[in-house]
Amino acid sequence: AQESRGLGDVYKRQKELGVYTVTINASNIDGTTTKDVSVEVVETMPYVVKFPTPSYLQTSTDRYTFADRPVFLRPLLEYFDNPRFEWSVDGQVMEGEVERMFKFTPSAPGEYTVSCTVSEDTPTEKISRNIDKGKTAVTATVKVVCVDKKEQDGFRASGSSKLWNKVYEYTPAPGQFINETSTIGGMTGNETSPEAAVAWATQRLKDKLHVSLGSFGGYIIVGFDHSIPNSGNQYDFCVQGNAFDGSSEPGIVWVMQDINGNGLPDDEWYELKGSEAGKEETIQNFEVTYYRPEGKKMDVQWISSDGRNGWVDYLSAYHTQDYYYPAWISENSYTLTGTCLAARNTQDSQTGYWDNQSYDWGYVDNFGNDQIEGGSTVDGSGQRNGFKISNAIHADGTEANLQYIDFIKIQCGVLAKSGWLGEVSTEVFSFEDLTK
């Protein structure tokens, strides 16, 4: 073992299979705490290959599309170090398709079974007398449904309101306004189920009060009583935030068509590209896993898919709720995936004030050049950003060419914190169709 600052003892490798108990002792001037942790040494890592669902609370991995419109399939992986990929459609291996993301374009209506076999491309390694690390392979399948209709067949005629009419899901990341029952946060303390969280968010938006999305990856999904058409080069809809000069907390915009016609946001999400799309520092498919704190008024720990780790600070000077981890998330950890922008927050060394700088265009709650006139630029009240459906892109960055949309998802697009201001967290107030 070796001593490492902030970590204690670091143990390298056990040579025998089995479950080992590691005892951790932590002490300071206030006393000593002891905790036992079980570590299992296994012969083969529990490799996982699975396809994602359209949102955290949904369970089906089925994908929907129209004939000649591609879907981009990318499995989630656990424990792989050097994965190799093999794709097949209805049992036929797709020669040359060896990347993690597979572009599948059905030419005719029907159901297709797409399989991805992932192997650990590592020569057999003798770890110890009883433990070998060798090649393993895991297969996951996903059903792709090519619906028997044209895109225009799903367009829903203009409804009675130009405003959003329903919140379908509210899954924020941990943050200082989550579970907050003061007049600032506005929660009641009874938001202990996804349904209750949606009801709360619905009422907040009706009152045009802010709904916080927490740290990176937190999101809200809303819909309208009609489809919003692609008007060409004009702004098709807008989202109200509270950005002002020096206070931008950008939210990524995703849109969806109700391809399967069931009235639910369980189809394909398309990102609306903004000014940062395609830049080297912008990371697609970025994952952050948040962990439930073991006690009250504690920071929320996280790890990210690029190997970083950190925490969402608990700000005891400003908020009194026990936990920043959403009370309606039953699991002890959850992972949020999306597009992550490079942070633009800086602190003035003289005054100590933080500046959350803006991005050019394409993001919610952002003091960019796509703002709709009418909002205050002093405190952000009524601040709105305009968005074009023509900016919808596929996962590979190519244009999606959508004729209309039915659902909108806003997702916090930055993993950062600004000292005493707390985490960078997108806030939304309202959604409006600008084509009516």
What are the residue ranges of the model-derived segments?
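Single conserved hydrophobic/aromatic residue that forms the stacking wall/gate
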Residues: 1-11
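Solvent-exposed segments in extracellular or luminal domains encompassing
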Residues: 9-19, 99-111
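A short beta-strand segment in extracellular, disulfide-stabilized domains
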Residues: 64-77
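Solvent-exposed loop segments of extracellular immunoglobulin-like
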Residues: 79-86
